[in-house]
Amino acid sequence: MDYXNFGNSASKKFQDDTLNRVRKEHEEALKKLREENFSSNTSELGNKKHYRAQERMSSPLHRLSPTGKSDDRKVKSPLDDKLRRQLREGNTRLPPPPFSSYGMPPTNRSNLDRIRRRTSSPVRTDKFASQNVIDDQRLEIKYLERIVYDQGTVIDNLTSRITRLESFILNSISDRGDKNFASLEHSRSFSGFPTNKTYGLQMGGLYENDMPYRRSSDNINKEGAREDRSSQIHIENESTEDILKILSSSFHN
């Protein structure tokens, strides 16, 4: 017995047996595949199993898998199908990924994230949205400025009208005051509003003809009885109703 070559011959025989067995199994598998899928002489081709219509365009493994196989559906993702369909139809604008994915390094991104990052950027979308908000605010500011300008025009018109009315009233009062002063110098009778020429409102009280207005007792002792000067107005002794009556009578006169 050859002990020196026993190990080599045993290992070589095992390798040959294994190679022959694998080759035989491979030939049987190829023969089975030819009989089931690639034999044009059989009339039962495709009667038992329904294959995809695009099997010529697909890979050999997909070509051998029937449509009703559930394992193939589990492996493929519906998002991948949607992406392929959108890319095939030319609609490459996909919704943006979550904002947290932009903080990741580029090596960890998948192809889908890269496509999304190229086609639609949330930064660009936010920029457009903020620009729209700024434009709306500018339009609103212009609208408010227009309202303020219109209100200012109305206020200016009212101010000019009030100024004209004040000047008209002051002119009419000054004319009446001159006439009243001329009549007071001759008849010492009161008519119209008292002016500074007749009753001056100064520090220390009322003044009448540049003299302080005193009480009725002082006036009586100096100027005589009250009946002699019935047309004079004694504001300190008269009541409010009497003053109003005197003023109304002076207006009518």
Swiss-Prot record:
Compositionally biased intervals (Polar residues): 1-12
InterPro entries found in the cross-reference section: Spc29 (IPR031392)
UniProt GO BP: spindle pole body duplication
Recorded superkingdom: Eukaryota
Biased composition (Basic and acidic residues): 69-91, 211-231
Entry-annotated residues carrying Phosphothreonine: T18, T240
Zinc listed as a keyword: no
Name under which the protein is recorded: Spindle pole component 29
Organism of provenance: Saccharomyces cerevisiae (strain Zymaflore VL3) (Baker's yeast)
Gene this protein is translated from: SPC29
